[in-house]
């Protein structure tokens, strides 16, 4: 029994979240795939990551949500009640009751805001919070160590990304409602796959929710291209001779046209440094109605 426990512990110790080292001339980037929400089971992070932060010239994240001064939320024309059919309205009512959320308030909110509210409340009920997300945790750690925190894009850009979707975010809202029953299992497996660095499972997760080509282009493809251009530019915010820790959502680092591939095309030599294990969970594609 003791041998089994020791063997299991040793095997588990090998598993860690996905991270890479990218080098080009005198610039070294340690790139970690993040999950934007989390819980204490995701910590401590691998010592290679905390050491990379401690010895870095800066932490680069998607955006520093602590810098919210001057952020403007546009006036949306459509409410949630405007965009849902009768069946979807009933589904929203049932979901809001199960989460203890005010249905009328959700119905009068823009679709994107309703979707975000439902997702955050559901994650909170499952024990996950954005304050425990990997990027937020590392940003706070960087600040206490007097390490610069560098944003790839301003917070206003991310707000606009959410609020200026077609029909004020109807597609995102409908997906949130239809996938609500699976979220508990899916999020659990996502966190387990992230902790294990299970690339195959994370790719399966990315294929679970089929975004429209427009959303995929806006949320993933265009941003990956923009980030690769910035990280490889001589006139952006990075020193040409420096070490940086880059932390972006894991979905930006897997699949077609990911940031790793784009950096390689920009002349970076990239090596995966993390040791992975298969996660003990399964994603299943939801049946299409």
Which functions belong to the PLM regions below?
Residues 217-289:
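A cross-kingdom marker for long, charged
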Residues 14, 41, 223-227:
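Short secondary-structure boundary/capping elements
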Residues 16-19, 23-30, 35-219:
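Structured, acidic catalytic/metal-binding patches in enzyme active sites
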Residues 1-2, 246:
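Positively charged n-region of N-terminal signal peptides that target proteins for export
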């Amino acid at each position: 029994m003791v041998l089994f426990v020791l063997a299991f512990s040793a095997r588990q110790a090998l598993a860690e979240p996905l991270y890479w080292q990218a080098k080009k001339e005198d610039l070294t980037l340690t790139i970690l795939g993040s999950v934007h929400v989390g819980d204490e089971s995701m910590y401590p992070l691998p010592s290679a990551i905390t050491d990379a932060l401690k010895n870095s010239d800066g932490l680069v994240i998607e955006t520093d949500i602590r810098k919210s001064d001057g952020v403007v939320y546009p006036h949306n024309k459509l409410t949630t009640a405007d965009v849902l059919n009768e069946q979807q309205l009933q589904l929203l009512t049932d979901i809001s009751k199960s989460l203890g959320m005010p249905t009328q308030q959700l119905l009068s909110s823009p679709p994107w805001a309703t979707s975000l509210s439902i997702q955050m409340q559901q994650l909170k009920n499952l024990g996950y919070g954005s304050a425990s997300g990997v990027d937020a945790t590392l940003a706070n750690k960087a600040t206490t160590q007097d390490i610069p925190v560098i944003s790839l894009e301003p917070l206003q850009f991310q707000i606009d990304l959410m609020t200026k979707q077609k029909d004020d975010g109807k597609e995102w809202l409908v997906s949130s409602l239809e996938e609500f029953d699976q979220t508990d299992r899916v999020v659990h497996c996502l966190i387990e796959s992230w902790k294990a660095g299970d690339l195959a499972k994370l790719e399966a997760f990315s294929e679970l929710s089929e975004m429209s080509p427009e959303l995929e282009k806006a949320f993933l493809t265009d941003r990956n291209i923009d980030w690769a251009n910035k990280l490889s530019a001589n006139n952006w915010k990075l020193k040409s001779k420096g070490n940086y820790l880059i932390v972006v959502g894991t979905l930006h680092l897997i699949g077609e046209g990911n940031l790793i591939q784009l950096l390689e095309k920009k002349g970076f030599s990239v090596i995966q440094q993390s040791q992975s294990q298969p996660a003990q969970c399964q994603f299943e594609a939801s049946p299409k109605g």
